[in-house]
A protein has these predicted regions:
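BTB/POZ (also called T1 in voltage-gated K+ channels) oligomerization domain detector
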Residues: 1-151
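Post-BTB helical module
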Residues: 102-221
Length: 221
């Protein structure tokens, strides 16, 4: 199924409350977009720690993971019983075992901090095969790759994983979609990927009369 980039102005996600696409009730790890003890607004993302570990994000885990979440962990049998209960979909989520606090660097402005958090959110979107959010897809892709290089050890693997993610999300489906073509053209220039750049460029040329109507045009022009 084709997945679409979600456009959001800065004001739409400024609070970073629970992200419905990245909040899994059975997840055992809570992700907070602030320093520990500096806010009471709660976690923004709830996912499985095993999935994070499977994504080869060792530096990210070493830097941010906290093991002393206050709740008592549930056993697998407890989780099975919980899932089978009649009120499962309306019941409170089971307690989490782990927490991660991922604050923006202190020197960033308010707008820069927002963009930092947005990229952190998109890092998890890549991890769990969800669409990206942001104002411009090209910028979001480049920011995500930079964050992957920070949080994962192998840049070559990161590039391959990003290209696979673009295909999975439908961002390389350029048919009648100048947004995708321009965004991937910009991203391929950053990546220095000749094949991807050429494919995006050819589609841009074929849609030349639509390019200036795209939100990506000023960024990539």
């Amino acid at each position: 199924m084709r997945r679409h980039f979600q456009f959001n102005s800065c004001g739409n996600l400024m609070t970073f409350y629970q992200d419905p696409e990245l909040w899994f009730a059975s997840g055992d790890c809570l992700i907070h977009f602030y320093e520990r003890g500096q806010s009471r607004r709660g976690a923004s993302i709830r996912v499985s720690l095993a999935d994070i570990e499977f994504s080869n994000c060792g530096p990210f885990l070493d830097r941010f993971l906290i093991y002393d979440a206050p709740e008592t962990p549930l056993s697998s049998s407890d989780l099975d019983k919980y899932a089978e209960s009649p009120g499962f979909f309306n019941a409170p989520a089971p307690p989490a075992k782990y927490e991660m606090y991922v604050p923006a660097p202190e020197h960033l402005s308010r707008e820069e901090a927002f963009r930092y958090h947005l990229t952190t959110r998109n890092f998890f979107a890549w991890m769990f095969e969800k669409p990206l959010v942001g104002e411009c897809l090209g910028d979001a892709l480049i920011a995500l790759l930079n964050r992957m290089d920070e949080f994962r050890p192998n840049q070559e693997v990161n590039q391959d994983d990003m290209l696979a993610y673009l295909d999975e999300q439908g961002y390389t489906d350029f048919r009648d979609c100048p947004d995708h073509a321009l965004a991937v053209l910009q991203f391929a220039e950053k990546l220095r990927d000749r094949e991807t750049w050429t494919d995006a460029f050819v589609h841009c040329a074929g849609m030349w009369d639509l390019l200036d109507k795209s939100a990506e045009f000023e960024v990539s022009h």
